[in-house]
């Protein structure tokens, strides 16, 4: 059979054409539109666990986010549960460490940030070079990215960090992220195969900085050693130990 792929920028247009029967499959619809499609009863809306994640890049390679206490302040100020409930209508779960739940190597005891304004302000007090503002890059590639950007802007505003939102064409955003020309940016990630390598090595190895995966430009020699050790054995228990140690 002949397969035709259409590029339709507006999610509302994708949803309308799907409802009318003009499309057989539509991708990247907001959760509220999925709920409306369910109620219409014309389209099958399937729900299943996913290893797809959405995360923010905090640029470790340049000021001011090369300061760990500033990154901690942002992490404590983020309203994770508010995003899950308000933006995703509960159809998601906050990550606990880089390896998603459901994949071997997941650490149920890994440290997890939560929204805590007091801890965010305490971390910010330790920052020597406090930023006048930070820029948040996003595109219309995912309809959830803009509300996540707005939520982040509001949350950080409460602790005195001004966030400027910059919406770009997705290709332009990727180019900026690849060059490290940003403060905060957003992205989605789905593994090519179900192995922690796709999250740990891609995201954190020093030699994968930029678009290859380490888009936060993180660098840590001890972490590099543990990640490389995890690739030198086929023993899953040993690999799990290395990956979990790298997260500490």
Residue ranges and their predicted role:
Residues 35-47, 179-182, 195-212:
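Ligand-binding "clamshell"
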Residues 158, 162-173, 201-248:
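Extracytoplasmic/peripheral linker and loop segments enriched in polar/acidic and small residues
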Residues 14-15, 23, 34, 70, ...:
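Short, hydrophobic alpha-helical packing/hinge segments within bilobed ligand-binding/sensory domains
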Residues 66-154, 219, 225-226, 245:
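Append "and occasionally in soluble cytosolic enzymes with long acidic Gly/Pro-rich linkers
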Residues 11, 27-33, 51, 80, ...:
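Beta->alpha turn/N-cap motifs
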Residues 1-36, 153, 162-164:
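Ligand-site clamp/hinge motif
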Residues 2, 7, 49-63, 138-140, ...:
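Well-structured core secondary-structure elements of compact alpha/beta domains
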Residues 125-191, 236:
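Ligand/substrate-recognition segments at binding pockets and active sites
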